[in-house]
C-alpha cells in the first residue's frame, strides 16, 4: 500500500475510487451521530432547558408574589404608622387641652384667691385708716399727758389735752385728705 500511495502521488482521501466507501462510512457515522444526538442528547438538553425555563417561571412567579406581599406589608406598615401618628396627635391634643384646662382652672382659683386677699387687705387698710386717727389721738393724748406730767410735775386735765390734739389732728387731716 505504501507503494501504491507513493506511486499515485496524492492524498488517498481524494482518490475517486475510494469515494463510495467513504460516503458509506460518512453516512453511517453521521446517521449514528444523528440518532445519538436526536434520541439521547437532544432530549436531555431539551428537558434541561424546559426545567430551567419552568424554574425561571416559578422564580418569577414567586418573586411577583413576594413583591405583592411586600407591597401589601408596606401599605399595612404605612397605615399603622399613619394611625400611630394620628393617635399620638390625638393624645398630644387631649393632653394639651387638659393641661390648658387645668391651667385655666388653677388661674381662676388663683385669681379668686388673689381678689379675696386684695379685698381683705383693702378692708384692713380701710379699717386701719378709719381707726388710725382715733388710735393716734389716744396715743398723742396719753403721750402728751405723760410728758406734761413729767415736765410740770402735776396732774394735767386730759380733756383739755384731748381738745388740743383733736384740733391739731383735724387740721393735719384736712391738709392730708384735702378736705
Curated annotation (Swiss-Prot):
F(1)F(0) ATP synthase produces ATP from ADP in the presence of a proton or sodium gradient. F-type ATPases consist of two structural domains, F(1) containing the extramembraneous catalytic core and F(0) containing the membrane proton channel, linked together by a central stalk and a peripheral stalk. During catalysis, ATP synthesis in the catalytic domain of F(1) is coupled via a rotary mechanism of the central stalk subunits to proton translocation. Component of the F(0) channel, it forms part of the peripheral stalk, linking F(1) to F(0). The chain crosses the membrane at residues 23-43. F-type ATPases have 2 components, F(1) - the catalytic core - and F(0) - the membrane proton channel. F(1) has five subunits: alpha(3), beta(3), gamma(1), delta(1), epsilon(1). F(0) has three main subunits: a(1), b(2) and c(10-14). The alpha and beta chains form an alternating ring which encloses part of the gamma chain. F(1) is attached to F(0) by a central stalk formed by the gamma and epsilon chains, while a peripheral stalk is formed by the delta and b chains. Disulfide bonds: none annotated. One of its GO terms (cellular component) is proton-transporting ATP synthase complex. One of its GO terms (molecular function) is proton-transporting ATPase activity, rotational mechanism. Keywords: ATP synthesis, Cell inner membrane, Cell membrane, CF(0), Hydrogen ion transport, Ion transport, Membrane, Transmembrane, Transmembrane helix, Transport. Belongs to the ATPase B chain family. Pfam families: ATP-synt_B (PF00430). PANTHER family: ATP SYNTHASE SUBUNIT B, ATP SYNTHASE SUBUNIT B', CHLOROPLASTIC. This is ATP synthase subunit b. It comes from Pelagibacter ubique (strain HTCC1062). It is a single-pass membrane protein. It is found in: Cell inner membrane. InterPro entries: ATP_synth_b/b'su_bac/chlpt, ATP_synthase_B_chain.
Amino acid at each position: 500500500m505504501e507503494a501504491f500511495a507513493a506511486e499515485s502521488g496524492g492524498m488517498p482521501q481524494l482518490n475517486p475510487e475510494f469515494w463510495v466507501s467513504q460516503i458509506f462510512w460518512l453516512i453511517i457515522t453521521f446517521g449514528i451521530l444523528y440518532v445519538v444526538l436526536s434520541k439521547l442528547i437532544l432530549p436531555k438538553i431539551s428537558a434541561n432547558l424546559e426545567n430551567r425555563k419552568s424554574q425561571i417561571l416559578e422564580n418569577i412567579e414567586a418573586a411577583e408574589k413576594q413583591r405583592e406581599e411586600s407591597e401589601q406589608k408596606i401599605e399595612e406598615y404605612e397605615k399603622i404608622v399613619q394611625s400611630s401618628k394620628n393617635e399620638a396627635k390625638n393624645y398630644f391634643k387631649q393632653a394639651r387641652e387638659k393641661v390648658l384646662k387645668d391651667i385655666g382652672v388653677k388661674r381662676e382659683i388663683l385669681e379668686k384667691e388673689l381678689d379675696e386677699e386684695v379685698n381683705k387687705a383693702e378692708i384692713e387698710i380701710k379699717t386701719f385708716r378709719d381707726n388710725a386717727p382715733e388710735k393716734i389721738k389716744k396715743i398723742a393724748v396719753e403721750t402728751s399727758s405723760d410728758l406734761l406730767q413729767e415736765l410740770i410735775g402735776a396732774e394735767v386735765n386730759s380733756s383739755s389735752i384731748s381738745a388740743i390734739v383733736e384740733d391739731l389732728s383735724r387740721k393735719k387731716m384736712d391738709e392730708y385728705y384735702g378736705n
